[in-house]
Amino acid sequence: MAEDIEEIRKKKLLELQKRYLEQQKAQEEAIRQEMELEAQLNAIMRHILTPEARERLGRVKLVRPELARQVELVLVQLYQAGQIREPIDDAKLKKILAQIDARTRRDFRIKW
């Protein structure tokens, strides 16, 4: 009887260890894929943005990461569709930021 309990404990421990290793591998794979996508995104941004525009987008990313991500996704879509023919400068990026910000910003009004 005690041997059966010990055997069950060992099986359970092995099963838990196996499950933990599988989860860890899945997390590592997800992190690796995310890093690859981020590297590809950065390469595209270097190609389609001027240095000043990249710097501005970096500052926006510090303050409003969700807005910066939306802008990056829009720029990648435009680039893949062939609609970006020349590098986007700082002035054009400001306009794009303003347009996307206007679409996503919500006004909160407090009535007294």
Curated annotation (Swiss-Prot):
InterPro entries: DNA_bind_arc, PDCD5-like, PDCD5-like_sf. The keyword 4Fe-4S does not apply. One of its GO terms (molecular function) is DNA binding. Keywords: DNA-binding. PANTHER family: PROGRAMMED CELL DEATH PROTEIN 5. Belongs to the PDCD5 family. Signal peptide: none annotated. One of its GO terms (cellular component) is cytosol. It comes from the Archaea. The keyword DNA-binding applies. SUPFAM superfamilies: Double-stranded DNA-binding domain (SSF46950). This is DNA-binding protein TON_1102.
